[in-house]
């Protein structure tokens, strides 16, 4: 018997990386997991097939509000309820923080649209169902929302907004709980070409390495399973923010 037997979880952006690791961690505790991606359909289906519990895949792009609504509706239609929403999907590209000319409106708008609007739309659509089950939300944010660092100024702005959203939902929508997991640099397919950053973090972080998706998934599970945790921004950075 797992601690999440009979629960239904939806993890956005879960065809790889933190989302995939979180899907596996949730399923290992007995949850039915809906896996999502905007484009990597085969990878998403492969994640579902590897889960130890019954899962389901739904393709949706969270930068489109109607697709967010359809993703929530599809989850509830398939499993009859929603207990856990993990907002992991996001987007970024590297832009030097000192080069404002390089931070084009297209980059700024896409970063905000996917990371902020998409997460908000998911929370908005999910909230009525989560209130029925007294469920919980975990937003995957970043230490870039706590310190002036990360892949770009726009990314830091977006993740700071999500940290604020997390606290607001926790304060005003109980008994639904809402927490955030704020990783440092994570070794995922998304950051596989950022070798210089991984080397830099490994050199200065007390942990001596970048995070793994599994490190982050463990933090997601802490937020999901600790029934008195709400409004917490949980850093998973190996001590990086202690030295930067």
Show which residues each predicted segment covers.
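Conserved glycine-rich Rossmann-like NAD(P)H-binding loop of the short-chain dehydrogenase/reductase
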Residues: 29-46
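Conserved glycine-rich cofactor-binding loop
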Residues: 8, 15-16
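Alpha-helical segment proximal to the catalytic Tyr-Lys
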Residues: 128, 167-174
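C-terminal substrate-recognition "lid" of short-chain dehydrogenase/reductases
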Residues: 120, 129-131, 212-236, 241
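Active-site helix of classical SDR
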Residues: 123, 158, 166
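Residue(s) in the substrate-gating loop at a strand-loop-helix junction
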Residues: 142
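Substrate-binding pocket helix/loop in short-chain dehydrogenase/reductase
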Residues: 68, 96-100, 104-109, 201
